[in-house]
């Protein structure tokens, strides 16, 4: 991984499973088991200590994801890892399909209306279940449905710009 490469937060350790060092994970990938495809992991403890972990194995077990870290063999070690965040380098993810985007790639893009009114910068995105919403921070915060072609007209990474059909007073 390059020194300044962007990291993507994929999940976190939420507890121990059994007594042999297995961990329960919360995954924000879709599907949730995809977290195991992207390695090595950069893990950051709640205290800020980071390390790189490769060779993590895992499985879907009911409502939990269970993982095995190389060298972790007891419950006490796992309990000390509770709250640890799991990251990967952006380059570990496959290229998105045409007309699909990774949220992280949209963050920090400029947003303006089809009339050229600058609305601000993408702060983050979230899902409502029916569609994604882009949160734009400028003179104020706006939440714009990330829906093509109704509201989002174009995404241009070279120009660092998203063009939307949106009333700037809304």
From Swiss-Prot:
InterPro entries: PRC_barrel-like_sf (IPR011033), PRC_RimM (IPR056792), RimM (IPR011961), RimM_N (IPR002676), RimM_N_sf (IPR036976), Transl_B-barrel_sf (IPR009000). The keyword Cytoplasm applies. It is found in: Cytoplasm. One of its GO terms (biological process) is ribosomal small subunit biogenesis. Binds ribosomal protein uS19. The PRC barrel domain binds ribosomal protein uS19. This is Ribosome maturation factor RimM. It comes from Xanthomonas axonopodis pv. citri (strain 306).
């Amino acid at each position: 991984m390059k020194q300044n490469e962007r990291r993507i937060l994929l999940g976190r350790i939420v507890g121990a499973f059994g007594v042999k060092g297995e961990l329960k994970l919360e995954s924000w990938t879709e599907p949730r088991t995809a977290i195991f495809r992207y390695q090595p992991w950069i893990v950051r403890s709640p205290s800020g200590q980071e390390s790189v972990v490769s060779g993590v194995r895992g499985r879907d077990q009911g409502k939990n994801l269970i993982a095995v870290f190389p060298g972790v063999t007891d419950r006490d070690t796992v309990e000390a890892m509770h709250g640890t965040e799991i990251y990967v380098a952006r380059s570990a993810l496959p290229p998105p399909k045409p007309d699909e985007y990774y949220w992280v790639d949209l963050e920090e893009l400029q947003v303006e209306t089809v009339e050229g009114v600058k609305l601000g910068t993408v702060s983050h995105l979230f899902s409502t279940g029916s569609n994604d919403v882009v949160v734009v921070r400028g003179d104020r915060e706006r939440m714009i449905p990330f829906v093509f072609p109704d509201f989002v007209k174009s995404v241009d990474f070279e120009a660092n710009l998203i063009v939307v059909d949106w009333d700037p007073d809304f």
